[in-house]
């Protein structure tokens, strides 16, 4: 029977006999004495085997990396000069008396402590990859976060209630994962993109405070922070307004960070969506970076420089400046790389001005401003740019001029890239946790492809008080009772006050050009139940995977999920998704179009 975990044996166990079980992390033969570093989930302990115990010595001699061993022995101090203060077990070792080989191991595809392994190799051999200490730490922290959430919400009176995994398809937003029904041929379930409607119905049912930590599914293109199946910390409350919900969830975030990382998140300032977009070009600004946009659209309406004037006069266009302190030292190569970078976001180029002498703001050859565009701008405009940005000698000013969406995304991304690469050395990056709430989101945004307004969050979000009539008369300026929790440039949680009246919900559907017939077909169960005395309610959902990625500093969300999918939505460990045989398809009343075409051609 195991008496101790390897990594937790310290000096308090000196002269005691212990039994440990684990994997051979490393084996060394030093002049007839064998040393084994035995590893389990808590860490490593050094085991010494000498020839005086011949059976144990023979077992140790046959063992290789990743063999599974049971070792019994006496704890003693390590010899002077061989201790490791970074480990709990670093001052002791076990002198083995008995060793049992519980299982042999084939040569692993990579060494457990090898950090230079491609992600494909890691994901194909995920079980071995999960033995690595970094992965063990990540998943342990994930567990601690989940348990902290449960403890906090339980203390706040929330009830953990499961909602269905097989539900109906309501294709608003991302694509659903569909599950064919065998007993109802030609009909399909959908895997939930969120428990949104069910948790609202639980409020109508009178449960008052609900939560669950649950899987959600979205069939969408993947990025570094996205997975087709992801875990959500989901909660909903009745009779609370947005301030009260934000207070509860802010308290939860603070408690979880304190318990798991011993970090005090401090205050959560609130920033209107319009301000976030105006100064940072993003609805999830990274406040560690002290760089802001400067608005120049009005100034450029009277300039002759076509690139800026065209964007300023364009419907929905924008011209902004981004001042970077001490950026005049950027090389031509660096600026070219930044130009290529903003092109990813649709920018056609990246204009800049290096500020060498603010005392000479002419547009002539002797100007204190260095740039190919200086000669195309009036001296008044140059002075105004320097004044508005507050630029000083040694700075560089980057410009964005295009449709507002392109400018916000391109210069917003540039702000992050420059801030992370140069901010720490130049005083405009603070390496600490910077949370905030982004509030007052627009209710709708215009989708040019669909030629209609769509919901910014989802169609069940309530309009801001006094904005109900704007849903139809002026949807572009209608604000929502929505709020996002943002931390270091990541949206870690999003929520809203919901619509609790059926007539208001029907108006929102109408504003989204969802016909009464379609409303009843897709959402009739919601509309019908809202008529039975639905309480005012609202909630919020946190992305657990994203939150733990941020807390661990992992490079990818895949590093905090035990068995993740690749960016092509595949599991390399099990080779999923996979084809199924014709019998299974027939049972589901399905036929593959490609196979049918091949059969017809034959």
Swiss-Prot record:
It comes from the Bacteria. GO terms for biological process: aspartyl-tRNA aminoacylation. Its EC number is 6.1.1.23. Its main location: cytoplasm. It is found in: Cytoplasm. PROSITE patterns: AA_TRNA_LIGASE_II. L-aspartate binds at residues 172, 218, 457, 498. One of its GO terms (cellular component) is cytoplasm. The record marks 30, 81 as: Important for tRNA non-discrimination. GO terms for molecular function: aspartate-tRNA ligase activity; aspartate-tRNA(Asn) ligase activity; ATP binding; nucleic acid binding. It holds the Pfam family tRNA_anti-codon. Homodimer. Belongs to the class-II aminoacyl-tRNA synthetase family. Type 1 subfamily. This is Aspartate--tRNA(Asp/Asn) ligase. The gene is aspS.
